[in-house]
Amino acid sequence: MTYVDTLGQQAKVASRQIAKLSTAAKNDLLNQVAKALVAESDYIITENAKDIANASENGISKIMQDRLLLTEDRIAGIAEGVRQVADLQDPIGQVVRGYTNLDGLKIVQKRVPMGVIAMIFESRPNVSIDAFSLAFKTNNAIILRGGRDAINSNKALVTVARKALKNAGITADAVQFVEDTSHEVAEELMVATKYVDLLIPRGGARLIQTVKEKAKVPVIETGVGNCHIYVDKYANLDMATQIVINAKTQRPSVCNAAESLVVHADIVEEFLPNLEKAISKIQSVEFRADERALKLMEKAVPASPEDFATEFLDYIMSVKVVDSLDEAINWINTYTTSHSEAIVTQDISRAEQFQDDVDAAAVYVNASTRFTDGFVFGLGAEIGISTQKMHARGPMGLEALTSTKFYINGQGQIRE
């Protein structure tokens, strides 16, 4: 029996044990986990410091190190997120629909757990607890495989959660951590159809592509965000400037940060020089511009074709000038990762056309792409942002981690 077989078998058994936990029992456990995280902050920070030291030695950028960093305040924030999940309405057992058919059968469709969820993710150790809390709230067992760069932090966080489960008399195998960070073990998890009911990858383009190519278990694709801001010829340019600055600079290392700026030719001569000046007062951003934009920006560099398809996760932004709304939409649909896209315009009909025609999970009018988030959307915590169309799309909250079952009651009916 392989390492993944052992984890999978334990998760399968655990999923059956926790399937019948009441809402009250689940909420109580989650609140205990939140308390334990705060109480164990020193231990978690000590383990996190090992990852930060390794990241520094390995030349990982300061922006990416910030994604790894756990402070007392950040741990308190993770704990608060767990409490908020406890406060969310429990979807398990909810009736989706109920009716009596022509044969007199009473048919009720209810939400039920998935069973065993596996998650492969990179950096950001808070994901381990976010994922556990959502999985547990929906009566699912979860197997977590984090990145090598956050191995000590993830291990510490999962250890705290497992200890809280054990203290509550609930199987600790409701959450398991894959300590082997080899690609071979990750790929074995991708094909563990005997145990895993759903796999969620959360990370960069390379991880997502690997999972798409190799997974045999059902997958919800998440994460990669080559997000665009299109500044239309009817835009309020002051508003557009603030939206671009926020979407690019507030937190560039996250998937809902803007990576590409598309500008209508009619306003480009006024907008781009002013944007460049305004953004430079806040943060140094490298603009990689097409030929027309390059002539208008003092410090821009020429863009390569690859730049328009790149999720930079840094203070870098590609710039494209277009001659029409249709060209903007076609351009964005060519390079989008179907995450979040935005238009800035005062023309309602053009805004509606953009929202209808752009193929993305979240399409904004006159707002920053940075709002694509489960809490912001009122869904509570999220396990990721789905960029595909089947089962779930956009921020995935509790309902995305459920399946449904039909309950049929009869009185001796037979089919003729």
UniProtKB/Swiss-Prot annotation:
Gene Ontology biological-process annotations: L-proline biosynthetic process
Disulphide bond pairs: none
Enzyme class: oxidoreductase
Molecular function GO terms recorded: glutamate-5-semialdehyde dehydrogenase activity; NADP binding
UniProt-listed CDD domains: ALDH_F18-19_ProA-GPR
Broad class of the protein's primary localization: cytoplasm
Cellular component, GO, one term: cytoplasm
Pfam family name, one: Aldedh
TM spans (from-to): none
Keywords assigned: Amino-acid biosynthesis, Cytoplasm, NADP, Oxidoreductase, Proline biosynthesis
Compartment(s): Cytoplasm
EC number: 1.2.1.41
InterPro entries: Ald_DH/histidinol_DH (IPR016161), Ald_DH_C (IPR016163), Ald_DH_N (IPR016162), Aldehyde_DH_dom (IPR015590), G-glutamylP_reductase_CS (IPR020593), Glu-5-SA_DH (IPR012134), GPR_dom (IPR000965)
Keyword Cytoplasm appears in the UniProt entry: yes
Catalytic reaction list: L-glutamate 5-semialdehyde + phosphate + NADP(+) = L-glutamyl 5-phosphate + NADPH + H(+)
Presence of keyword NADP: yes
The family this protein is said to belong to: Belongs to the gamma-glutamyl phosphate reductase family.
HAMAP family: ProA
PANTHER family: DELTA-1-PYRROLINE-5-CARBOXYLATE SYNTHASE, GLUTAMATE SEMIALDEHYDE DEHYDROGENASE
Functional summary from the UniProt entry: Catalyzes the NADPH-dependent reduction of L-glutamate 5-phosphate into L-glutamate 5-semialdehyde and phosphate. The product spontaneously undergoes cyclization to form 1-pyrroline-5-carboxylate.
Name assigned to this protein: Gamma-glutamyl phosphate reductase
Organism lineage: Bacteria, Bacillati, Bacillota, Bacilli, Lactobacillales
Recorded name of the encoding gene: proA
